[in-house]
From Swiss-Prot:
Signal sequence residues: none
UniProt GO BP: defense response
Tissue expression pattern: Expressed by the skin glands.
Superkingdom assignment: Eukaryota
Keyword Cell inner membrane recorded: no
Stated role: Antimicrobial peptide.
Record organism: Xenopus boumbaensis
Positions in coiled-coil regions: none
A single Gene Ontology CC term: extracellular region
Protein known as: Magainin-BM2
Length: 23
């Protein structure tokens, strides 16, 4: 469902932001 897609996108977004913050 849509909520599952949003949840996956949220996890990916957090990981992506984490990588940006590290550098």
């Amino acid at each position: 469902g849509v909520s599952k897609i949003l949840h996956s996108a949220g996890k990916f977004g957090k990981a992506f932001l984490g990588e940006i913050m590290k550098s």
